[in-house]
Amino acid sequence: MITDLFLRGDRSAVIANIKRAATEGRFNDKVETNDPVLDLSQERALEANYLRMRKKPAFWLNSHLELALIGTTASVDTRHVRVVGRDNLAGVTGGAVVTSNHFSPGENLMVRKAARGRSLQIVGQLTNLEMGGFLGYLMTYGTLPISSDAKYMGREFPKLLGGSLQKGNWVLIYPEQEMWFQYRRPRPPKRGAYYYAARFNVPVVSCFVTMRDTGVHLTGDFNRIEYTLHILKTLRPDPKLSVRDNSLAMMQADYAQKCELYETTYGEAIDAPFSAADIVGWHARG
């Protein structure tokens, strides 16, 4: 699996950052050690270039090619990933916001397996557009980029997201924001995903990936892992509530059902102290 590729190399510094942040209750902190950082002028240059690209006919062609390539990759790569709860998708016929836990650069392929036959775009950091090679190609044409630029986020991003949802696409937004490598617990979500679902009046397709350490060595630091993607109860905006109240209600309901699944699967309270087992497959070093 592609996710196995990311289990190689020394992740001890990242895991130490996760432990520190979890122990201190900072569940949305950035923990990766080598993420690129852009200043505002660099962000605006990337935004402008991306928006120019979207207006060209080649962008439409490449977007459809990216969808075909990533769909084929997901089908092959996730053939051993179990998906449960498809019955919870009954009645989801158009655009939707998808939420899931963010623990690996490759876990979105599992969400694509759940989407099966639906176009899925991913909301990701603007820095992804600077990647080169095949991965950079996928990021450019399969991602809706977000930025710290308030003007872009207030004007351009809602247009991009709303347009995608209106076309019937699913859009994956990570409410946990930052990736915590191989971390198994659901983390308290931020409101953005649910705000956009309420604003554009689309359902929230709630996903959560559970992981099982097989005990079979894969790398020097990690065992091979089995993954199960759970599709939980779909959440829908209440027409009697405001956008703000809807977003808060769906955020709380989504986190609650993810926590319930976690506690049922792992037999541990969501607020138990951090342990090495929280980083699934990792061989803790003394």
Where are these regions (language model features)?
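Short amphipathic alpha-helical segments and helix-helix/interface helices
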Residues: 70-71, 111-112, 135, 161, ...
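Catalytic core of membrane glycerolipid acyltransferases/transacylases, capturing the structured
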Residues: 92-151
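Structural motif corresponding to alpha-helix initiation and N-cap regions
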Residues: 83-86, 131, 155-158
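Short, basic, glycine/proline-bearing loop/turn elements
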Residues: 71-72, 140-148, 176-179
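A conditional alpha-helix N-cap/helix-loop micro-motif detector
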Residues: 79, 104, 150-155, 186-187
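Non-catalytic C-terminal accessory region of glycerolipid acyltransferases
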Residues: 1-38, 158-286
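A generic secondary-structure micro-motif detector
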Residues: 59-62, 123-124, 150-151, 182-184
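Membrane-anchoring hydrophobic helices of lipid-metabolizing enzymes
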Residues: 1-97, 106-110, 135, 140-141, ...
